[in-house]
Each structure stands twice: as C-alpha cells, then as structure tokens.
Amino acid sequence: MIARDDVTGLILAGGRGSRMGGTDKGLQPLHGTPMAMHTMMRLTPQVGGLMINANRNLAAYESFGVPVYTDSVPDFAGPLAGMLAGLEQCATPWMVTAPCDSPFLPTDLVARLAQAIEAEGAELAIPVTLDPDGRRQTQPVFCLMPVSALDSLVAYLSGGGRKIETWAASHRLAEVLFDDAAAFANINTLDELRAHEAR
C-alpha cells in the first residue's frame, strides 16, 4: 500500500508563462491568493510533504514555507525538467506532480492514482478525462511516480526527449478515469484567470 507519508507532492512552477505574457503563472492571484498556493492547499492533505519547482521569483515561492528547487538542466526544458529536479530531491519513495495553475485539482487525486498503481502493478499513474465529445484526454503533468524512475528520466532527457506522455508510456502506466474534467483545468492566460475570478 502506498501511504500518504510515502508521497511527496511537487508543484511545477518552473515555466516561462509565455501564454500569460511572460508573467509567473503560479504567483498570479486568484481570489486574492496566488494560484500556486491554491494548488498547494489542495495537495497538502494528500501527501506527506511538499516542494516547489521554480526558476524565477524564488523568494516569493520560498515564502510559501516549503522547499523550492530549480531545474538542474538548463533553458526551461519543460515540465520534465521540473520532475527531474523533484526526483533528485525527493526523500520519499513516491512523488506526485501538479502544475502551479491547477487550483481545482481533485482532493482524491493521490489516493486514486495510488490505488491504480497497486491494482494494476503499474509503475506510474496519470489521470484521464473525457472532453465534451467523449474523447479521452490524458493529463500527464499530474503524475504519481516512484523515485526509482529517476534514471529513466535522466536517460530520456539526455536523449533530447521533452514529452511527458512519451516518457510515461515507456513504463507500466496506469490511466485513471476522473469524471470531473474541470478539476484539471489549467489557467493559461490572463483572460482565463479573469473568467475564473468572475465566477
């Protein structure tokens, strides 16, 4: 059984925020609270500890009271670089990731991913949702993985790989269907942020 205390949560806040005009998405306020803090509050009850991957505004993220780690590979290499930084620092057997702009993530995310890993004998687990037309959409940036996946991730990144889906598919992968696609909504633009503020 994968216990809560065996899992560390990693909030991915290391991107450029290019779709948000270069602003740091995780620090943008939603109802007066930074988006990364919303994500942190949703994830905290599900894990034994938390850390943040960020590459700028480090003092602001450190003020959240959890460890902050920068990418160990250069040039904003994407979320996999953040996952690598987390795996390098993770002190528990398991790590779960979530992007900083996912303030509505499910409160049973970790439990359901862990159950699927155990039931299916999988190595990694990611959520799957259905779009309005019933098409499956994987949500690979939300991923429960063992720390032992570090070596395969190093090898994949060293070979120039950057796609989470491709790396994840090279493992025994459990895909877990979640009914509420909106729970995985990313807020990528300032317009989207304003729309959520108005709700």
UniProtKB/Swiss-Prot annotation:
CDD domains: MobA. InterPro entries: MobA-like_NTP_Trfase, Molybde_CF_guanTrfase, Nucleotide-diphossugar_trans. It catalyses: Mo-molybdopterin + GTP + H(+) = Mo-molybdopterin guanine dinucleotide + diphosphate. GO terms for cellular component: cytoplasm. It is found in: Cytoplasm. The keyword Magnesium applies. Mg(2+) binds at residue 101. Keywords: Cytoplasm, GTP-binding, Magnesium, Metal-binding, Molybdenum cofactor biosynthesis, Nucleotide-binding, Transferase. One of its GO terms (molecular function) is molybdenum cofactor guanylyltransferase activity. Coiled coil: none annotated. GO terms for biological process: bis(molybdopterin guanine dinucleotide)molybdenum biosynthetic process. GTP binds at residues 12-14, 25, 53, 71, 101. Its cofactor is Mg(2+). Pfam families: NTP_transf_3. Its EC number is 2.7.7.77. It comes from the Bacteria. Gene3D superfamilies: Spore Coat Polysaccharide Biosynthesis Protein SpsA, Chain A. PANTHER family: MOLYBDENUM COFACTOR GUANYLYLTRANSFERASE. NCBIfam families: molyb_mobA. Transfers a GMP moiety from GTP to Mo-molybdopterin (Mo-MPT) cofactor (Moco or molybdenum cofactor) to form Mo-molybdopterin guanine dinucleotide (Mo-MGD) cofactor. HAMAP family: MobA. Monomer. The N-terminal domain determines nucleotide recognition and specific binding, while the C-terminal domain determines the specific binding to the target protein. Belongs to the MobA family. This is Molybdenum cofactor guanylyltransferase. The lineage of its organism: Bacteria, Pseudomonadati, Pseudomonadota, Betaproteobacteria, Burkholderiales.
